[in-house]
Structure formats: C-alpha cells, structure tokens
A protein has these predicted regions:
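Bacterial N-terminal signal peptides that target proteins for export
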Residues: 1-8
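Gram-negative bacterial Sec-dependent N-terminal signal peptides
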Residues: 9-13
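N-terminal signal peptide c-region/cleavage motif recognized by signal peptidases
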Residues: 15-18
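Long, terminal "pre-/pro-" and other extracytoplasmic accessory regions
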Residues: 20-183
Length: 183
C-alpha cells in the first residue's frame, strides 16, 4: 500500500510533463483500454489494469489526445505501461520499480463522467476560489481513499499559478465526490 501511495504522489506531482494534444483525436480514457489491454495480455497473460492517467492535457469533457494504461503481472511481479494515441500504442515500457498494485474495478466510470461529477460538486466553491486548469486525471485503486482502500477512484488535479493544486477524488463506481483539498 505504501509503495502504491508513493507511486501516486510521484505521478500526481509529475503533472508538469503533460503536453498539448496538438491534432490528436480526443477520447475518453476507457476508449484506449482495448488497445492497451490486448498488448498487455500478449506481454503477460495475467496482466491486470492498475492505473490510467492522461498523457496530454485533458479537455473540458474529460477527453485527452493520449492516455497511459499501467498493467501489473502478479506472476512476473512486473509492471508495464502503454501510452495510447489515435487508437494505437505510441510507447510501451516496463517500469523498474516494485510495488503492490491492485487492479482497478471493472465497472469504473469513464473520464468524462468523472470530470462532470467533479465540476458539479465544485459549483459554488469554484465561483469563490477558482480551481485553475485541469492538469491530471488518474484512475487507481487504493491510493486516495483511506476509509475504503479497496475503492477505485478518479483523482483530478487542478493547478493555479501561485496557489496550491486542488485535488478532487471521485468514486469511480458511483461518480460521487469523496473529498476535495488543496495541497
């Protein structure tokens, strides 16, 4: 669990690497799962999806031009990440770190619905204190909900120049906002 949280912090702090989507076809996160999943199963027959994150700036509908899908093989105790853009894999590489990585639940809501839930919950608070620009959307299990560590969640990260980032955690099954904080 500690390794997974460390990975979450590293990834969420690395949102500065997010680039513009240029002319890529924008798509919600779930649309790339079949492509990445087929490659992951050829890499390891027991590969399980453990992490999804935008690789390029997410748009206002929860879409991005490129998404990363991290798979973990319990049999080999290895993780491999696939970056999907325009329906094909642009990059695939093994991660050289060891961590416990529980698979995300199968019934997760897509990125657009997660963003809608986060935006709706922010409502009046957003009018008083702007959230800034959406920089990252991360789907994972067991990283951002201490009360229910088995829960799959979306974590949305907004950045504002000169202010701490805003984090919004959305239950990936019910689309309910679980918590929001700045930090």
């Amino acid at each position: 669990m500690t390794r997974m949280r460390s990975l979450a912090v590293l990834v969420l702090l690395g949102v500065a690497r997010v680039a513009a989507a240029d002319d890529a076809v924008l798509f919600e996160a779930r649309a790339g799962v079949a492509t990445a999943g087929a490659a992951a199963l050829s890499w390891s027959p027991d590969a399980a999806l453990v992490w999804v994150e935008n690789d390029e700036s997410p748009g206002p509908l929860g879409v991005a031009g490129r998404w990363s899908y991290l798979y973990y093989s319990e049999a080999t105790d290895q993780a491999r990440v696939y970056s999907v853009r325009d329906g094909r894999i642009l990059a695939a590489e093994n991660l050289d770190m060891k961590f416990d990585a529980p698979p995300v639940a199968d019934d997760w809501i897509d990125s657009g619905r997660a963003l809608s839930a986060a935006e709706a919950a922010q409502g009046d608070a957003a009018k008083k204190a702007p959230r800034g620009a959406l920089r990252a959307m991360v789907l994972a299990r067991g990283t951002m909900d201490a009360t229910e560590p088995d829960r799959t969640t979306w974590t949305l990260v907004y950045s504002t120049p000169g202010a701490p980032s805003t984090f919004v955690v959305v239950d990936a099954a019910s689309a309910k906002v679980l918590r929001t904080w700045r930090g």
